[in-house]
């Protein structure tokens, strides 16, 4: 299994509940590669100092959230040069219109206007290289990444067709791993939008490193409605559904139990319950994070070991592809 998070902005509850917690739950079942995808982070304008600091923060949060180095290889994408090299090879056989049709590119290109970089168009090919280098069987994806995984499969199939027709395939076609729960945590300021690091409002998300006071402030100010009594699945009350679902996932209670508990509540009663659940979830993560960051050499050594382990696998795949393309090897 392979997955990763960009070191841009702060990791938030959506990243944890929608992705990282699921990685932790399944890590003993798979051979895992968890990457800090810093090459993806520079496809939009970025601050170099923040990128460097956030790279270590994300790696430390992987560990603090429960990723076990005994069950996973943790590494930084740019530390393994095969990612960039395979991306170029895949670029040369990927039709341009495949990339122009990607929904995320269209959305982000509109925001950037004339300043849109070629790297943003090429983002899905880099993602394909990330996945294909490790012969990944499963890739955890949310709804917003399904199209990128489909493109990865198309690119792998094209390589196999062009260079290994009637022969064993060169690249493995990965399958999506869609989480059963917690897959979509919504914004605190708009229950119809996904919680996002890129949202300009800090009030829209709860970051994994937010203090208890910051958490209380954000939940106190989060968008609600004037209706007393809280219920799931009312299309006219997206915020109620979002906050109840968040409470359910954090407490581990059943949907039916939460519905019964909160049926007659007002927001003034419910928000302290949600606040306590968030703080209780994040407290051990923050404690472990602080311990890791207090020992920088441990984190750097772990990432160096991860780079070596990842490069061994990635370079073997890259060599296989280069030979298929007709390159000579040194």
UniProtKB/Swiss-Prot annotation:
Pfam families reported for this sequence: tRNA-synt_1b
Protein name (database record): Tryptophan--tRNA ligase
Taxon lineage: Bacteria, Bacillati, Cyanobacteriota, Cyanophyceae, Acaryochloridales
Similarity field: Belongs to the class-I aminoacyl-tRNA synthetase family.
Function: Catalyzes the attachment of tryptophan to tRNA(Trp).
Catalytic activity: tRNA(Trp) + L-tryptophan + ATP = L-tryptophyl-tRNA(Trp) + AMP + diphosphate + H(+)
Domain of life from the UniProt record: Bacteria
One Gene Ontology term, aspect cellular component: cytoplasm
Annotated Gene3D superfamilies: HUPs, Tyrosyl-Transfer RNA Synthetase
Gene expressing this chain: trpS
Chain ranges for the short sequence motif 'KMSKS' region as given in the UniProt record: 194-198
Entries under InterPro entries matching the protein: aa-tRNA-synth_I_CS, aa-tRNA-synth_Ic, Rossmann-like_a/b/a_fold, Trp-tRNA-ligase, Trp-tRNA-ligase_bac-type, Trp-tRNA_synthetase
Subunit structure: Homodimer.
Residues bound to ATP: 6-8, 14-15, 142-144, 185, 194-198
EC identifiers of the protein: 6.1.1.2
Primary site of residence: cytoplasm
Keyword entries, A-Z: Aminoacyl-tRNA synthetase, ATP-binding, Cytoplasm, Ligase, Nucleotide-binding, Protein biosynthesis
Binding site for L-tryptophan: 130
Gene Ontology molecular functions: ATP binding; tryptophan-tRNA ligase activity
PANTHER family cross-referenced by the UniProt entry: TRYPTOPHAN--TRNA LIGASE, MITOCHONDRIAL (PTHR43766:SF1)
Record-level GO BP terms: tryptophanyl-tRNA aminoacylation
Segments carrying motif 'HIGH' region: 7-15
Annotated localization: Cytoplasm
